[in-house]
Curated annotation (Swiss-Prot):
Subunit-level organization: Forms a heterodimer with smc2. Component of the condensin complex, which contains the smc2-smc4 heterodimer.
GO molecular function: ATP binding
UniProt cross-references to PANTHER family, sorted A to Z: STRUCTURAL MAINTENANCE OF CHROMOSOMES PROTEIN, STRUCTURAL MAINTENANCE OF CHROMOSOMES SMC FAMILY MEMBER
Residues involved in ATP binding: G189, P190, N191, G192, S193, G194, K195, S196
Start-end of Acidic residues biased regions: 1-16, 24-60
One GO CC term on file: nucleus
Keywords tagged on the record: ATP-binding, Cell cycle, Cell division, Coiled coil, DNA condensation, Mitosis, Nucleotide-binding, Nucleus
Species assigned in the record: Dictyostelium discoideum (Social amoeba)
Protein role: Central component of the condensin complex, a complex required for conversion of interphase chromatin into mitotic-like condense chromosomes. The condensin complex probably introduces positive supercoils into relaxed DNA in the presence of type I topoisomerases and converts nicked DNA into positive knotted forms in the presence of type II topoisomerases.
Region of interest: Disordered: 1-154, 1385-1415
Protein name listed in UniProt: Structural maintenance of chromosomes protein 4
Length: 1415
């Protein structure tokens, strides 16, 4: 009720209507309450049955957990109605959610509930019992479109399954609307949510412009909201399918393969601010016209879209005028006639009416012209009779002359036949030669084809060779790189091995020396222990010996002891000084060795670094130069290749020009040969003219004019022999020339006498030709047009020139026959005979410029010979240059390959040098550090040297003192020894020897310990060097192994590339040999063809000579025939004045037998005498009477014009009668067809209006009963309990009902598969809304209705509810199957009733308690 009141406020109805609506609402409430009570009982029974079925299903399938109830504080994103339904559904544990239920699950429920949900007021309407359902409308109307039927007779129809909107208007993203029901779907939702955008989306898909959808530009249709800004495209897709209805509300069968999708897109572009749009059918782009045609075949007419009723349009249907006032305006008459189909006759009726008016005017005009011509004809009768007598004499003279000229052609005709027989023999020989030439040409073409194919294959092989070379070059570059890396690594490994070997030897030597020194120390220590003992023994012996000589040597011993006491401290000092000097000498030797090695290594590294930098710099300079040279070589190759390609084109052009020059030369030679005899006669006659013997000779006809080179073949074909005619002024001059030729036996010639050709001057004026085709005569440029025009016209006549044979055929075989020649030499005569198409067309009959020198052809021949010689020379020179260029290209390519190989090598050298520099740069600081340490050692060495010098000086001083004391002791000892004899000396030597050995052992032990320490340090250094080199060697060997593995793989690739290149090279060599052989054969074939051409040229020359002779004989015959033809032409002058059979008789061609009759001299004399007699009579008649033969022609014209006018008048009369009959027939067919459909629609309108208004009446009435199409159709209705009213006087709701009744009646007459309506119930009260909804529900099963409505009485009866709601300024959709809520509503009602009963009981108890307390 709230929604009804809001709608009534919006449409602003009158207060009385509002009261009626409120009363009717209350009545509907009562009816609804009664219906609910009955339905509750039925639903309880159904609920019990459903619960049993659900329990059985639950045993088979697990129960789905229901979602928890929503909190009241949390706002719902669903529209209000949907939210209520979802809350109710949560109260039923075993009821599945109803949103978007499948059609298959609803089929059984919808069929059971469809009858139970029908309101009672619908069953109580005044509907006739025998009214057939809407889908059983008459199909006998020929103009009615019925649903498409399948092969077995079952009707199928189109339906919309769903719509998908993406970024369209209020729909953001891809939003699916549907699925729609096959019959009745309703779109519901609050105002502003985007319901009407559903219809706007359909209008958009069906081709409506943006302004028709309430916007200005296509780009404005794209969605734009706060959360979805700057979208660039939108689209709408409508999904269709064809179905076959099955029993049950939801049951149908989809026609296999009938599904299709229609899509339209809108897109913003940078260049087009308005946006662009495209149409798609099944994702394929289509044009709108094609889409309209496809949908029209499916039953959707987008041009006359009666299936779309927009918001506010429903009232406009009934408000249409009876008839459109202005052209293109649609009234009710046009609306109905468009649906009935009788509108198809209207264009023919209007066109026929216009034709009848026009032909009436033509009839009156034709009758007047016929009467005028009849009067003019009668006035010329007498003059016509006088002219016919003159014409009779003239025709008899023509007849005699015709016989005379036919007799004169007999002799040359026989001679011509003999020459023709010889010509035929030569032509047969030429034909055989041509066959041979054709075979040779075919063979040459085959060679050329093979040569072209070979060249193509050679190019392909050359490409393969270049590819192989590039691959090989790549592998070679890699190989050079790997070789350099291998070489570098091997050098490093070799160096490592050398160092390792050296250090290993050093370590072995160190170990051996250490062992020896240790052994020496052990031996020295052992001797050091044993020798003193032995010394004591020997000293005791010596002492004993001395004691025995004590008396003799006492003084000497005392002196010696004194000296030895002096010597003892000095000996100790000497030993100490000597030990210090020896130790410092050993340390000095070790330190000097390390210092010299470090310095030498640093110097070597610095020198190697300088060398590496020098190599890198040198290689960089070389690589820069090589790269520049490589780029230069590549540029040279490109330039040479361009020159080679250009040279080949030049060579081909020169070869073609050479061949063309040769052909032109042969042609001119042939022409000169053909014209030799002709030029001889002409030269002789011109000399006679110059000498003054014969006057009036003008020359050869072809030399007296010129024609564009384009028309040379045409003029030569059409009038070759005529162009050789010699033009003379008078008959006397012609006879003199003939006599000269006979005397000098120069041959034959044909002469044209200008004074006898004056009659042709009347034909020189311009004439109208088909398609303005030029006359050959008009294309000739003459030396003196006034003088020679008649001669040229006699030669070519009205011959026309066409570009092609097809054009010539159309002109020649038209309504009037024409003589036509084509540019390529085909000729069609007026008789229909066609000639042409030979090997070579005729040329040279006339020059392109006016001829001044008769020797022009010879000069041209010399020019062509010189040109040909120059071309041959240029061709040879060009070929030599091409060979030279190819050699240069090969040299440049070789140099390029060398440079491409050198560059990687130099690059590797640079990389190796850079690597070495980097290594040395790292090593040198280390060596410098070592050298720095050595410098410290050097200072230590210097210090040791200085100290050693001091110590050595001290040692020398001590040594000097010791030596002196030892010398003195030695002298004393010698003295003692001399006293003691040899034994004492020996013992003394023995003691000294032992003492010396003891001293030596002490010194050697010190040296050995110093050497062992030095060797230990050297061993540590050697081990470190050995470890470093061993590690470096392992790394280098691993890198070397990897490089070698890569190199092996590269060698395989290189081998493959080499083998591939060798294979391609072999193929290339073989292909070049094949090409060489084919070229040889090609040249041979060319030479054979040239020989054949020379032979053919001779035969053609011979044939042309025969033709020339034949032409001469033909010229004689033609002269006679020309004179005979002239007589025929003269006779044809009178063809417009006398009967045509008489003209044919006087110019008839005689048979050979008839000619033989006139061959006798007597017959010829009689014929000549008769000619003179008739000539005299004609001259006499001309002088005596002023005869005007044109009167005969004028009379004939008037007579013909009279008959023509009479026939024209009769034809117009007949045509007028036929048009009148057709006009009446078309009007009758239109009226009959319209009235048949109109009657059905009117009856159905009355029936439907009575039903939906419960007693009202409606009628479509023809305003003019005589002619329904004159004033149109009026629509009158009588609402229930009211009088008849015009539509304009009805209320909004009554207008809506009237329009809907008319729409339903039209649907009955011509069903549409689809109807889309936007708020058609806006102006209706709830009662009428319910009636309309029930009508759509029950009576339109054969169509799909999609209705946008806010009225619950409408959408509650829908088979499918499509909810539209908006959140965040974005429209969304949800689809509900109402039938799935049947059980839900029953359970809810039962629960509510039990709750109410409990509440009533509690209230009663409370009242009883209150009453008790009061008491």
């Amino acid at each position: 009720m709230v929604e009804d009141e809001e709608i009534n406020d919006q449409i602003s109805e009158e207060e009385e209507e509002k009261k009626k609506n409120n009363d009717s609402d209350e009545e509907m409430k009562d009816i609804d309450e009664e219906e609910e009570e009955e339905e509750e009982e039925e639903e309880e029974e159904e609920e019990e049955e459903k619960e049993e079925e659900e329990e059985e299903e639950e045993e088979e399938t697990p129960k789905k957990p229901m979602p928890p109830p929503q909190s009241k504080a949390k706002p719902s994103s669903q529209p209000p109605d949907i939210k209520k339904a979802s809350q109710q559904s949560q109260t039923q544990k075993n009821t599945p959610p109803p949103i978007q239920t499948s059609q298959s699950s609803q089929s059984s429920q919808s069929s059971q509930s469809s009858q139970q949900q029908q309101p009672k007021n619908i069953s109580q309407t005044q509907q006739p019992k025998n009214t057939p359902p809407l889908q059983s409308s008459q199909t006998s109307q020929t103009s009615q479109k019925t649903p498409v039927s399948s092969n077995n007779g079952i009707e199928k129809r189109l339906m919309i399954t769903k719509m998908v909107m993406e970024n369209f208007k209020s729909y953001a993203g891809a939003q699916e609307v549907g699925p729609f029901h096959k019959c009745f779907s309703s779109v519901v939702g609050p105002n502003g949510s985007g319901k009407s955008n559903v219809i706007d989306a359909m209008l958009f898909v069906f081709g409506y412009r943006a302004k028709q959808i309430r916007l200005n530009k296509i780009s404005e249709l794209i969605h734009n909201s706060e959360n979805h800004k700057n979208l660039t495209n939108g689209r709408v897709s409508v999904h269709f399918q064809e179905i076959i209805d099955l029993p049950g509300e939801d049951n149908y069968e989809v026609v296999k393969g009938s599904e299709f999708v229609v899509t339209r897109t809108a897109q913003k572009t940078g260049n087009n601010k308005d946006g662009v749009s495209k149409y798609y059918l099944n994702d394929k782009v289509v044009k709108l016209d094609d889409l309209k045609t496809i949908l029209k075949d499916k039953g959707i007419d987008l041009d006359n879209n009666r299936f779309l009723i927009l918001q506010g349009e429903v009232e406009q249907i009934a408000m249409m005028k009876p008839k459109g006032v202005h052209p293109g305006e649609e009234g009710l008459l046009e609306y109905l006639e468009d649906i009935i189909g009788s509108k198809k006759y209207l264009p023919d009726i209007e066109a026929t009416s216009k034709l009848i008016e026009d032909i009436g005017d033509k009839r009156t005009s034709s009758n007047n012209r016929m009467k005028v011509v009849e009067k003019e004809k009668d006035a010329l009768q007498q003059e016509r009779d006088n002219a016919l007598e003159y014409i009779d004499k003239e025709l008899k003279l023509i007849h005699c002359k015709s016989i005379h000229y036919q007799i004169g052609r007999s002799k040359p005709e026989r001679e011509k036949n003999e020459i023709a027989a010889k010509q035929e023999m030569v032509e047969k020989q030429l034909e055989q030669e041509l066959v041979t030439q054709k075979a040779s040409n075919d063979k040459l073409l085959e060679f050329e084809k093979n040569l072209k194919q070979q060249n193509k294959q050679l190019d392909e092989l050359n490409k393969q060779m270049a590819k192989c070379k590039n691959e090989l070059l790549t592998t070679e570059k890699k190989g050079v790189k790997y070789k350099e890396e291998t070489k570098h690594l091997k050098t490093k490994v070799k160096k490592n091995n050398s160092v390792i070997e050296e250090e290993t030897k050093k370590q072995a030597e160190f170990e051996r020396s250490t062992i020896i020194h240790k052994q020496d120390i052990v031996r020295f220590e052992k001797e050091y222990v044993e020798l003193p003992k032995e010394l004591i023994v020997e000293e005791k012996k010596l002492e004993s010996m001395l004691n025995s000589l004590k008396g003799e040597v006492t003084e000497l011993q005392r002196e010696m002891e004194e000296k030895q006491k002096q010597l003892l401290p000095w000996s100790k000092k000497h030993s100490e000084a000597k030990a210090v000097v020896d130790l410092k000498t050993s340390e000095l030797a070790v330190l000097s060795k390390d210092f010299n090695g470090a310095t030498q290594n640093l110097d070597d590294a610095i020198k190697a670094l300088e060398d590496a930098k020098t190599i890198s710099s040198t290689r960089k300079n070389n690589i820069t130069k090589s790269k520049k040279e490589l780029e230069s070589v590549k540029a040279i190759i490109v330039d040479l290749e361009k020159r080679l390609a250009s040279g080949k084109v030049t060579e081909e052009n020169l070869y073609r020009n050479t061949m063309d020059a040769k052909r032109q030369l042969e042609q001119i030679k042939t022409n000169l040969s053909e014209n030799s005899s002709r030029n001889t006669i002409l030269d002789r006659l011109l000399k006679i003219k110059e000498s003054g013997q014969i006057s009036g000779i003008h020359g050869r006809l072809g030399d007296l004019g010129a024609i564009d080179q384009k028309y040379d073949v045409a003029i030569s074909t059409a009038a070759f022999s005529q162009m050789d005619n010699i033009i003379v002024e008078t008959t006397a001059a012609a006879e003199a020339c003939v006599e000269l030729l006979r005397k000098e036996n120069l041959g034959r010639a044909t002469f044209m006498i200008l004074e006898n050709l004056e009659y042709q001057r009347q034909n020189l004026g311009p004439v109208q030709t088909p398609n303005n085709t030029p006359r050959l005569f008009d294309l000739i440029k003459m030396k003196d047009e006034k003088k020679y025009a008649t001669a040229f016209f006699t030669a070519v006549g009205h011959t026309l020139v066409a570009d092609t044979l097809d054009e010539a055929t159309k002109i020649a075989y038209g309504a009037k026959r024409h003589r036509v020649v084509t540019l390529d030499g085909s000729l069609i005569d007026t008789s229909g005979a066609m000639s042409g198409g030979g090997l070579k067309p005729r040329v040279g009959a006339m020059n392109s410029k006016l001829k001044g020198d008769p020797k022009e052809d010879k000069k041209k021949l010399i020019e062509l010979q010189d040109n040909l010689s120059q071309l041959d020379s240029d061709l040879r020179q060009c070929r030599d240059e091409l060979v030279e260029i190819e050699n240069q290209i090969q040299q440049a390519q070789n140099r390029r390959s060398e440079l491409e190989l050198e560059l990687p090598k130099m690059d590797m050298d640079i990389k190796a040098a850079i690597t070495k520099c980097e290594e040395l740069t790292k090593v040198i600081p280390q060596l410098k550090n070592k050298a720095k340490l050595s410098t410290e050692k050097k200072e230590q060495i210097d210090s040791i040297k200085e100290s050693l010098i001091v110590d050595q000086k001290s040692l020398d001083k001590v040594q000097e003192k010791v030596n002196k004391l030892e010398s003195e002791v030695q002298e004393i000892q010698n003295s003692i020894l001399n006293v003691g004899g040899p034994q004492l000396k020996m013992q003394k030597n023995k003691v000294e020897s032992l003492q010396s050995r003891i001293d030596s052992n002490q010194t050697n032990t010190t040296k050995a310990n110093v050497q062992i320490k030095s060797l230990a340090k050297s061993m540590e250094k050697s081990i470190k060097i050995l470890n470093e080199n061993t590690k470096e060697k392992d790394e280098n060997e691993a890198a070397l192994a990897e490089i070698l593995e890569k190199y092996k793989s590269l060698e395989k690739e290189n081998l493959k590339a080499t083998e591939a290149m060798e294979a391609v090279s072999e193929q290339l060599r073989e292909k070049e040999e094949e090409t060489k052989e084919i070229r040889k054969e090609h040249e041979k074939a060319k030479k054979v063809i040239e020989k054949i051409k020379v032979s053919n040229s001779k035969l053609e020359t011979q044939i042309e000579e025969f033709k020339t002779l034949i032409n001469e004989k033909q010229a004689e015959i033609a002269d006679c025939l020309s004179k005979f033809a002239n007589q025929a032409k003269k006779a044809k002058i009178y063809k417009d004045y006398v009967d045509e059979s008489l003209i044919n008789q006087v110019s008839a061609i005689l048979t050979p037998e008839e000619i033989e009759q006139y061959m006798e001299a007597t017959e010829q004399q009689n014929l000549i005498a008769k000619i003179h007699e008739l000539t005299t009579q004609i001259q006499k008649i001309s002088k005596e009477n002023n005869v005007n033969i044109e009167v005969v022609k004028d009379f004939q014209k008037k007579e013909q014009e009279y008959h023509s006018r009479k026939a024209e008048f009769d034809e117009i009369e007949k045509e007028r009668d036929n048009l009148s009959k057709r006009y009446e027939s078309l009007r009758k067919n239109r009226l009959d067809e319209f009235m048949a459909g109109f009657t059905i629609i009117t009856m159905k309108l009355k029936e439907i209006y009575q039903m939906i208004t419960l007693g009202g009446d409606a009628e479509l009435e023809i305003i003019d009963r005589e002619d329904p199409f004159q004033e149109g159709i009026s629509f009158s209705v009588r609402p229930p309990k009211k009088s008849w009213k015009n539509i304009s006087n009805l209320s909004g709701g009554e207008k809506t009902l009237s329009s809907l009744a008319l729409v339903f009646a039209l649907h009955h007459y011509k069903p549409n598969a689809l109807y889309v309506m936007d708020e058609i119930d806006a102006a209706l009260d709830f009662k009428n809304v319910s009636i309309i909804a029930n009508y759509i529900k029950e009576r339109t099963k054969n169509a799909q209705f999609i209705i946008i409505s806010l009225r619950n009485y409408m959408f509650e009866l829908a088979d499918r509810l499509v909810g539209i709601y908006k959140t965040d300024n974005c429209t969304k959709s949800v689809t509900i199957n109402p039938n799935s809520f049947t059980s839900l509503s029953t359970t809810t009602t039962t629960t509510n009733n039990s709750q109410q009963q409990q509440q009533q009981k509690q209230q009663q108890k409370q009242q009883q308690q209150n009453s008790t307390s009061q008491k």
